[in-house]
Structure formats: structure tokens, C-alpha cells
Swiss-Prot record:
UniProt protein name: Histidine/lysine/arginine/ornithine transport ATP-binding protein HisP
Known partners and oligomeric status: The HisPMQJ complex is composed of two ATP-binding proteins (HisP), two transmembrane proteins (HisM and HisQ) and a solute-binding protein (HisJ). The HisPMQ-ArgT complex is composed of two ATP-binding proteins (HisP), two transmembrane proteins (HisM and HisQ) and a solute-binding protein (ArgT).
Function recorded in the entry: Part of the ABC transporter complex HisPMQJ involved in histidine transport. Is also part of the ABC transporter complex HisPMQ-ArgT involved in lysine/arginine/ornithine transport. Shows ATPase activity. Responsible for energy coupling to the transport system.
GO molecular function, one term: ABC-type amino acid transporter activity
Matches recorded under PANTHER family: AMINO ACID IMPORT ATP-BINDING PROTEIN (PTHR43166), HISTIDINE TRANSPORT ATP-BINDING PROTEIN HISP (PTHR43166:SF15)
Membrane topology reported for the UniProt record: Peripheral membrane protein
Main location: membrane
Length: 258
């Protein structure tokens, strides 16, 4: 039986004035897929991810989440937005983002950060949200002592693990990771990648923008190489890394794998 389609992005474009950043990018993620998006800085990777959950408004394209077509209309600037605010709210509970710079609320404790969205967006009681938050904080290795601290008192690796717990607490269909290790000191990268690998092994559906070629090669089920806003090459990791066809991808990997 074919796996259930969790996310389908069709022919996504993004323009800023006359400059086209995304030139028709498509992606299909089935349940349990781990899709890594690689490419040079400025290739459109993060913009693509942000357009998927409408932190950026795409210019053209269609997005289907769990078989449900997202109803899009044009805003006054000609960009696409979700027609129904309730559908946008639902979309963001189904596709949760882990950001490069953590984006934790500085005035809330670690535990409060993870409880907030389940209470405000999902309507959970404080008791249920607390139980859920404790479960996912334990999953990412944040102990009780750290749970009462404010983000400023945590290492970057701990903050990013809290950010992952916060995304997991929404129990989404797809986890979106936007370069989750690029703001970390090198010695802290491994602890975050280990959590992500564990999530992949548990069958979580993930779309990951990353510069971590080891993760992309060994954990992904599918790899997309973006170049100048287009998919230059894609395939399974062994194909993309072991036998790249595009000269641009060959050059990129030569530089990345030194």
C-alpha cells in the first residue's frame, strides 16, 4: 500500500518585484519521508520552506496538506495568501517549523514555551498542555532542572532542542526544519542532529533545509538540490551524493564535502 501523502507542493514561485527567487519548485512528502533540501546560500531553500507555511507569501503555486487543498487568493500586492484565516491557523498546526535562531519566547520559561501553542492554538487545558510539554521535553533530553529556566540561560543546543519539543508538542503532520544547526557552535551540532535522526527513525515526516551533508546523505529518504530557485537535481541520497549528474551539483558537493 502506498504511504499517505502528507504534503504536496506544486510549482511554487516567489517573486520580489522583478526578481524571481523561486522558479517553480515542487515537492511531495509521504508519511515517514525525510526530505533534505541542499544548495548554496541564496538558492531559495529557506524561502521555499517559509512559503510552505505562509511565513512568506508565494507568488504562484498550490499546496495540499494531508489531501486538503489550501484555498489561496491574491492579496493587494498580487501575492498568494490563505483565503480563510481558520485554514491558515490549521495549516500551521499541521506543518510546524523549527527555526535557525530558535525563536523561543524570552519572557517564558522552557516549559511555558512548549505549553503555549497547545493551549492557545489547540485549546488544550493547562494540565494537558503541561503533560504534553513534559513528554516532549523529556524526548529531546531537557531535564526538569532546565524546564524552569528562561531561554537565555540555556546553551544554543539546548535552545534548539526546546524549539524541536515545541514543534513536536503540536503533534503535526510534517516538521519543517530551517537550517536548524547553522546558528550553533560546532560542538553543539551533534546533539541536535541526534534528536533529528531519532525522529526520522520513529517515522516522523520531515522537510529539512540543511548544510549538514552527513545528515542529508545518511538520514534522508530523498534529497533535493536547489540552484538559483529551481530543482537542479533530486533523488535518493545514494544517487544524489554517490552519482551526481548535474555539473552544478558535482561542484557543490566537491566544495561541501572537503
Amino acid at each position: 500500500m502506498m504511504s499517505e501523502n502528507k504534503l504536496h507542493v506544486i510549482d511554487l514561485h516567489k517573486r520580489y518585484g522583478g526578481h524571481e527567487v523561486l522558479k517553480g519548485v515542487s515537492l511531495q512528502a509521504r508519511a515517514g519521508d525525510v526530505i533534505s533540501i541542499i544548495g548554496s546560500s541564496g538558492s531559495g531553500k529557506s524561502t521555499f520552506l517559509r512559503c510552505i507555511n505562509f511565513l512568506e507569501k508565494p507568488s504562484e503555486g498550490a499546496i495540499i496538506v494531508n489531501g486538503q487543498n489550501i484555498n489561496l487568493v491574491r492579496d493587494k500586492d498580487g501575492q498568494l495568501k490563505v483565503a480563510d484565516k481558520n485554514q491558515l491557523r490549521l495549516l500551521r498546526t499541521r506543518l510546524t517549523m523549527v527555526f535557525q535562531h530558535f525563536n523561543l519566547w524570552s519572557h517564558m520559561t522552557v516549559l511555558e514555551n512548549v505549553m503555549e501553542a497547545p493551549i492557545q492554538v489547540l485549546g488544550l487545558s493547562k494540565h494537558d498542555a503541561r503533560e504534553r510539554a513534559l513528554k516532549y521535553l523529556a524526548k529531546v533530553g531537557i531535564d526538569e532542572r532546565a524546564q524552569g529556566k528562561y531561554p537565555v540561560h540555556l546553551s544554543g543546543g539546548q535552545q534548539q532542542r526546546v524549539s524541536i519539543a515545541r514543534a513536536l508538542a503540536m503533534e503535526p503532520d510534517v516538521l519543517l526544519f530551517d537550517e536548524p544547526t547553522s546558528a550553533l557552535d560546532p560542538e553543539l551540532v551533534g546533539e541536535v542532529l541526534r534528536i533529528m535522526q531519532q525522529l526520522a527513525e520513529e517515522g516522523k515526516t520531515m522537510v529539512v533545509v540543511t548544510h549538514e551533508m552527513g545528515f542529508a546523505r545518511h538520514v534522508s529518504s530523498h534529497v533535493i538540490f536547489l540552484h538559483q530557485g529551481k530543482i537542479e537535481e533530486e533523488g535518493d541520497p545514494e544517487q544524489v551524493f554517490g552519482n551526481p549528474q548535474s555539473p552544478r551539483l558535482q561542484q557543490f558537493l566537491k566544495g561541501s564535502l572537503k
